Amino acid sequence: MSAPKPRIAAPNASLAGHLLDQYAGRIARSRRPYIIGVSGLQGSGKSTLAREMKVQAEGRGWPTEVLSLDDFYYSRSDRELMAQQIHPLLRTRGVPGTHEIELLLSVLAALPQASDKLHVAWPHFDKGRDTRMPPSRWPRVTRPPKLVIVEGWALGIRPQPQVALDEPVNRLEREEDADGSWRHWVNKQLRGYQPLWRKFDALIVLQAPNWDVVRRWRGETEEELLARHAPLAMDAASMERFLQHFERLSRHALATLPALADSVVEYDDDRHMTGLTHS
């Protein structure tokens, strides 16, 4: 029986600094914006880490932008149309196929040319209203960044083998996707995400222990929202159904992403960091 891994006292500030140290030489040498993907399942702290990395990177003199995959969701009205034309489960944002990936790619292509004459803007998604903010409230830059951080859930994930789609993984799939058409469609959409993954110069994966822990982390977040009476906060039953949309690909990500990552940050059940490896 192997000895348990020691906990590493590394809050976001020191973790962000270590990760920037790891890629500093490559960032400095790059003639175009260096792009880092930060991938983590719900509740893993990817957004917080990305923000801290931006603060520290700019402190080192590197103009930095953070793009969130969540900001590129299609609007509620667009997803309603998808639900009518393709599958009802596409009303719920989150799975591959509910992001406007071509727009994100166009933003990445435009950022090196950003200037006072060429402003580069990208969407900001209002999760409370389940739609995009008006363009007047979108982030806008007028200088080319040295570093771009793209953060999101399951960045880098590859499509599952077709045979893996045969059996449902939960009640949602058994009852609302009995013929498998939704999960096959979502898996097919992942092919369109691969050009984005290939833009990453480095991929950092925040690795949770297992799917049950991810469910608990996300549930804790929702409990906090309910306590604050936040709009669209979900009760336990609604939360469980919502998470079932992501269970299949979350389990796939937990099993496959570490082998595809340049850096893996491992966490225990309580979000304490237990390991950091670089390939």
Stretches found by the model and what they are:
Residues V55-E65:
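Post-Walker A helix-loop "phosphate-sensing" segment adjacent to the P-loop in P-loop NTPases
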Residues A154-S279:
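Conserved NTP phosphate-binding and transfer environment spanning the P-loop NTPase/kinase superfamily
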Residues E65-S68, F72-R129:
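Conserved nucleotide-sensing/catalytic segment adjacent to the nucleotide-binding pocket
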Residues P33-G37, P63, L147-I149:
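Residue-level preference for the first positions of well-ordered beta-strands
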Residues L49, M53:
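Hydrophobic positions on the alpha1 helix immediately C-terminal to the Walker A/P-loop
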Residues V107-I157:
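Phosphate-binding/switch loop-helix module in NTP-utilizing enzymes
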Residues M1-I36, L41:
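Extreme N-terminal, non-catalytic leader segments
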Residues K46:
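Conserved lysine of the Walker
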